[in-house]
Structures are given as structure tokens and as C-alpha cells.
């Protein structure tokens, strides 16, 4: 390879990345999933597009995709709160195992019929497209404030369901490649145990060792992210080499690191955020270059039928069956989880496996997987926000700081500096600082007015345009968001949580004459909190709601995981 060729490679690669970044701003305004934009740039630069770049190296695409997926899952794990496992772990694991198996079976039968394949070949197609994609889910849910049970279930499912898809794909490839020799039950059992057991053990064990190492050595701030990234990739590679799930390993490694105090935490998260964006862009650009759209025309109609069959039939059935034991999920929750069965890079990566194994119909599997991913991103990705609102699982947003950064007062410090800009609609504008009900342990470190830094006292009145710098912890963000929230411009947002708010220990009997409740012998002795448990179970999250006596009852406030306030929404505002 000549120096000129290398330079052209750098130029073209940088141009494609820059175009992808610039178009991402447009995608958010028109409602197109950003991953679809990256994929589209790659397709346009490819063989059938204006760019005319010929790229058909599946091994390079496999390498880039695996590396990118590892970085994305490491970052996703570090941003997942263990506290969300309280309501989401077992449902997510049920979806990640039984759900994937059911989706594989149903999709496989449809694929066998639509593409005139035998049942094993059809099941292989089902296994390839059977798992949701972490990159797509993390990307499209970012910035959306969903019901914690629903959001955490989707994120944990997407981070942990790939081992099942890999297990099914590898097993079916082995059966198809064995040409009548068969595959023993012991092989299948050991493969399953290796994928999940070894992947989990190496991820948690490697994460603990890396956490110990980070906190025992002193490095320049910029080297901590390098250490985390290299350590994560080491565990990812070792797990894959030993037959475990590297994807599960690096996700659990990130989960362990993200939920423990460690040096350089904020620098690590900041650098990983940029690396994750670069990984998403690089992965979908390469996959877009790999695709030749003209090849999809031959499979377009049956692949479209398969994609919609999976979206409207296979995924909903698998979700409802997998979540049967979990009564805390409402019908709306289940329908939304069914709709967010986003497919992304993982099915395309798995579709490379048959090509590397030299199976017949390998190109067909690849083209079908690519078509299913395109339809999923277009149909499910573009409608995700509307689906969340229709299912009533999206909570009203609270303002986040315009900037937040770590304050390294001591090595494991979890102090942060939050910066808020006060617009004219903020509740607190015009109020003296002494009247602000600041969360315990938080402090206003500075107040900027114009270009001047003021030294505020309790009598200082806040004005439009002021910038407040607040010292606090991550747990204070919700309270600070409420404190610096805007006056409602639309009435429906505050009324999401109800028109009136009640303490959970109030007896229903005392509310009956006010709201016209008709109470039977059992209900007249119940409190509001006991009514919640009766209808929703005891694992409650913000925004949980049910209809009773023509009223909507909504969990409106929690403290340390316990419900303290319930909102009542009147019928004409439902």
C-alpha cells in the first residue's frame, strides 16, 4: 500500500465521519434515528451510491463491528445503575433468554416458509435476527425519560441477550455444517453454559481486578480512560477465546466499574462518551459500505414480510410470554417493550458467521439480516418517541445541567459541579437565594451574571440569564432538576402526575366523600399506599398508574425507593 493510498484512506474516512457528525444534527430535528443516518452515509459512499467505493471485506467489517460493539457496551454498562436491577433484572433476563428463543423459533418458521428453506436454515435466520441490539437501544433511548421499569428492562435486555443469539447461531451453524453427523446434547449444554457462565464470571472478575488496579495506582488523568478501555478489551478477547460471551463480559465489567467509586471516574465517562460516538459512526459506516443495495432487491418482498412478521407477531408474543410471571408490568408496558425490539449491528455481525463457515445460502442470510435491520430502524426507531407517549411510559422531562464535571477533591471523590442557566420561565427567577429549598449537602459555589462572578448572599435575588454553579452529587440531580424547572408552558406536562396529590398513608374512607368513591367492605379499610400495592404490586416506580373508580392513580413521588406521594388525575384530564 503506497503512501498516497494511505493518505486517501485517511481523507475519505475523515470526510465520511465528518459528514455523519454534521448530519446527526439534522436527524434529531426530523426524527430519523441517528444510527440510520450513519448507515445511510455508508451506503451512499458504497458501490451503488455516488461514492462508488467497492468494499466487500467481511473479515474487516467483522473486526470493526466487534471492536465498536465492545466499546459501546462498556460505556452502556458504566452508565447503567445497579439500583435499576431492583425492578428490571429478572424480567430482562427472561427476555434475554426465553424471549430470544421464542423470537428465533417464530421468526425461523416464517423465514423457512418465505424463502423456501428447510426448518434448520429458517431457524438460523431467526437466530441471526433474534436479539435486540445494544447500540441501537442505548442510542435511541438516550435523552428519553422513560418509566424506570421499562427503560431499565430494555437496556439490561439489550446488553445481555446477545449470548443467547450467539449460542443459537453457533449451534445451528454447527448442525448445518455437520452434514448428518449431528451435534450432541452435551455440546449444546456446554456451549450454553460457556456463553453465559464464563462470560459473566470473566466480566465480573475482570471488572473487580480492574477496579482494584485503578484505585491503587496513580496515573495522569488522561490515562485512566485508556486503562479502562484496554482492560475491557482484554477481558472481551479472553472471554471470546475461551468460548464465553465477550459481549456479556465487557457489559458486566462496565456495570461493575460504573457502580463503584474509583479514580478518574468523570474523565473516564467523558472520554468513553466520545469513543462510543466514534464507534457507532465507524461501525455503521463500515456496515453501510459493505451493503450493495441492488442485492437486496431479490429478497425485498419476502424480507419485508419477515421484518413485519417479527415486529408485529414474533416479538410481541415473545415479550408477553417472557413477562407472564412479572405482574408489575402493565399492558402498556408490555406493548411498548414489544415495539422496542430494535435490531442493529449484532444481527449483521451474526450474519457474517455463516459466510465465514462457508454455508450454502450464506449471502441470503446476510441480505435478509441487513433488510430486517433497515426496516427495524426505519419503522421502530422513527416511531419510538410517539410509541412511548401513546403507551404513557414517557415521563415529563426535568431540566438537566448545561454542564456537569467531576470535582477531584480526593481520589474517589463523587462530588460534581452542576451548571444551570436560568431562563425567564424558571420558577426560581425573582426569588432570593434563601428561599431556594436546596437539597441537603448541595451548595451554590458561584453565581454568574453577564460576565461578572457575584458573591451571593441569602438576600441575592436570582435574575433571568443568571448562571448558577452548584456543588452536589449525582443523587441530587432529580431534586435540583425540580428546583430549577420551568413554569409549565403546556398544561398536560405537570398533570401527567395528577391534578391533586396525596400522602400514601391517607385512608380511602376519608377520600370517598371528596372524590365520590364507592368503597366495598375491603376498600374502606385500605390506605392509598395499600391500594397501590393491590393494583400494581410492591415494586413501584415513578409514573406507575392504574384506573380505578373513574380516576387515574399515579405514583408521583418516591424517596429512597419508597412511594411518598400519589397523584389523582380527574377523568376530563385523562
From Swiss-Prot:
Main location: membrane
GO molecular function annotation: flavin adenine dinucleotide binding; potassium:proton antiporter activity
Keyword Magnesium: no
Organism (species): Shewanella sediminis (strain HAW-EB3)
Any one annotated GO CC term: plasma membrane
Transmembrane stretches, start-end: 6-26, 30-50, 58-78, 95-115, 119-139, 163-183, 191-211, 219-239, 242-262, 271-291, 301-321, 335-355, 364-384
Reactions catalysed, as given in the entry: K(+)(in) + H(+)(out) = K(+)(out) + H(+)(in)
Domain RCK C-terminal: 405-486
InterPro entries: Cation/H_exchanger_TM (IPR006153), FAD-bd_PCMH-like_sf (IPR036318), Na+/solute_symporter_sf (IPR038770), NhaP2 (IPR023729), RCK_C (IPR006037), RCK_C_sf (IPR036721), Transptr-assoc_dom (IPR005170)
Family the UniProt entry places it in: Belongs to the monovalent cation:proton antiporter 1 (CPA1) transporter (TC 2.A.36) family. NhaP2 subfamily.
Protein name: K(+)/H(+) antiporter NhaP2
This protein's UniProt keywords: Antiport, Cell inner membrane, Cell membrane, Ion transport, Membrane, Potassium, Potassium transport, Transmembrane, Transmembrane helix, Transport
